[in-house]
Amino acid sequence: MTINLWVSGEEYVPRSKRTIPVENPATGKVMDELALADKSDLDHVVAVAREAQKAWARTALAKRVDIMFKFRQLVIEHQDEIADAIVREGGKTHGDALGEIARGRETVDFSCGINAALKGEFTDQASTGVDVHTLRQPVGVVAGICPFNFPAMVPMWMHPVALAT
């Protein structure tokens, strides 16, 4: 089976048609093939992300937090399945995989409560005749390059904070 990309809520078959094997490190057995993206695929994904970011930037903070809590719940409900995938693909023990998920979930938990820090501030007369405003202004699309040896923890360190803010 070939594992393709997931873009904008659906499977995306990269134009490159190149793949690499996904091996179980304990047995050396090839379990799947992973599709590789090329520059044209990356350009497509960035364009789709930029379009999606426009709507996301206008999404109410409370709604983003609700989505983060739902994501948190899904991680909890499916942690054994995620751990099993880490064991199969990365060769970790089940306990190590669960620990990786737990460490990543700490950042998900933080992201669920980030709304208190994103409300903005106003300081009247911070200096003579100077008022200070702090505003949330979404910057745009971000990307994360994650190491193979922490396939759950590192993405959970990056993406929830980017999405919540």
Language-model regions: role of each:
Residues E121-T165:
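Conserved small-residue-rich beta-alpha loop and adjacent elements
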